[in-house]
Regions:
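Flexible, compositionally biased loop and terminal segments
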Residues: 1-187
Length: 187
């Protein structure tokens, strides 16, 4: 399919406002996934990176995430980035604060003054943002990186979103005229 980096939004910083039992279940599911799938990710040459805050995650989850990140660091078939306790607003504010204070983490590899994902592996700008579940909003997800992203909306809920629908989204994306602020190529 030509996808080298895939970022999925597993848990927004705003999701902490959900009922405690739901948050606990989501964190347990994520922790179980990291423990269960870490070896398979490594075997399939998939690099796993977690973006978002770690200070509010359980110590056990953070340890397991760091272990799997280290184990998969050399993966080059796919870079799977999972956003957990993630907020674009928070990331952008922290980057602005670091830039204002002159901190070294304020620099990014694109040559600009701000890195909206300090502490996270820098990824290229988003090409295609797929929103599942029938929602028509970005929900504070990769706002900086999605400045010129093509948007594709699906009524399918994430757990049921299958390869065929992903293929349709990518095929639609490939037919689009990406201008990045310029006049259409057809003009």
């Amino acid at each position: 399919m030509g996808v080298s980096i895939l970022t999925v939004y597993a848990f927004s910083s705003d999701n902490w406002r959900r009922p405690v039992s739901e948050v606990d279940t989501l964190m347990k599911l994520f922790h179980d996934y990291v423990r269960r799938e870490g070896q398979r990710l490594a075997e399939n040459d998939v690099r796993l990176s977690i973006i978002g805050r770690r200070d509010r995650l359980s110590l056990g989850l953070v340890r397991d995430v760091e272990r799997i990140e280290a184990k998969t660091a050399g993966g080059c078939r796919l870079h799977l980035r999972v956003a957990i306790d993630y907020s674009s607003r928070h990331a952008i504010l922290e980057a602005a604060k670091a830039a204002f204070l002159g901190l070294p983490e304020a620099k990014n590899s694109r040559g600009g003054p701000l890195d909206p994902s300090p502490g996270a592996p820098l990824a290229p700008d988003v090409d295609l943002l797929i929103r599942t579940g029938g929602e028509k909003r970005l929900s504070d997800f990769l706002l900086w990186e999605s400045a010129y992203a093509e948007l594709w909306f699906s009524d399918t809920m994430w757990p049921e979103f299958a390869a065929a629908e992903l293929s349709n989204a990518i095929a639609d994306f490939r037919r689009r005229d990406r201008r990045f602020g310029r006049v259409s190529n057809a003009a």
